[in-house]
């Protein structure tokens, strides 16, 4: 490979992000893999990479899809080869690995976190999968600890509450909950009822209906033990806490949760997770998002990526609806602002590179 420098979106000294054409292409060693980026998606987490979360010169971005360009000498366990179409979520804006991020012409990832894109999906669809399915897998099968998994379904069809079912993480969670043998109970606005049902929701409720919680309790016989909060606000946490059955259970959010709400029910165990934890490495972002290295999380990442690859291979999961824009990395900056301004609703924003 002759090219030494690349174009990427990188952190600035004043806590922002800019387009640079003189960035270093990641070095490939050990079990890492170099990927030529073909498409990226913009997520809410990208809007939060500002101020103290920015490392000057670090490449931004999490979700990508592309073609394998080079394979490290120790990347021999996952049958990843030059020319493979792959996607995943990595940790952009990483002070410990600043040359690696999704918003670049080339990026890198360890072999065991890569998802092979099946022939039925485009690069653009592949770029929308990583954060949604990685994060929900961690939430459902590690944090909540659902018995069973999509490849070995549970024998008891327990109800699992997915709050915010029409979001990208929501539709991913609904599919995984159903495949794992559970009954996905979800909430969204009435205009999205048919959408979430198409992804496998067994029952859907209007979260704005004043009788919503009582209707959920009636439908589930007051037996919800597990709740995944894809919206993760104080209000959504209060809703989930009230919907969880009398015996208590587990609640997992995708953002730091309210300690005040957590104290209202001692029989409910709260947790919150971040997708990059699955890499098993230290997350050196400011509190409360700092995490120490955790080998157990890395082991789960290996396991869960293998599960997802099997699900993709057999066409058992499908991506959230996407809206595709052209214009490359320069336009990604506009996309981040559109996500921040909530101009994109009900779809994942994807850019072709």
UniProtKB/Swiss-Prot annotation:
Entry EC number(s): 1.-.-.-
Listed InterPro entries: ADH-like_C, ADH-like_N, GroES-like_sf, NAD(P)-bd_dom_sf, PKS_ER, Trans-enoyl_RdTase-like
Protein name, entry field: Trans-enoyl reductase eqxC
Purpose of the protein: Trans-enoyl reductase; part of the gene cluster that mediates the biosynthesis of equisetin, a trans-fused decalin-containing tetramic acid with antimicrobial activity. The PKS module of eqxS together with the enoylreductase eqxC catalyze the formation of the polyketide unit which is then conjugated to L-serine by the condensation domain of the eqxS NRPS module. Activity of the Dieckmann cyclase domain (RED) results in release of the Dieckmann product intermediate.
CDD domains xref list: enoyl_reductase_like
Gene giving rise to this polypeptide: eqxC
Positions of substrate binding: 131-138, 275-279
Lineage, highest ranks first: Eukaryota, Fungi, Dikarya, Ascomycota, Pezizomycotina
Keywords: NADP, Nucleotide-binding, Oxidoreductase
Catalytic activity entry: L-serine + 7 malonyl-CoA + acetyl-CoA + 2 S-adenosyl-L-methionine + ATP + 8 NADPH + 11 H(+) = (5S)-3-[(2E,6R,8E,10E,12E)-2,6-dimethyltetradeca-2,8,10,12-tetraenoyl]-5-(hydroxymethyl)pyrrolidine-2,4-dione + AMP + 2 S-adenosyl-L-homocysteine + 7 CO2 + diphosphate + 8 NADP(+) + 8 CoA + 6 H2O
Similarity comment: family membership: Belongs to the zinc-containing alcohol dehydrogenase family.
SUPFAM superfamilies noted in UniProt: GroES-like, NAD(P)-binding Rossmann-fold domains
GO molecular function, one term: oxidoreductase activity, acting on NAD(P)H
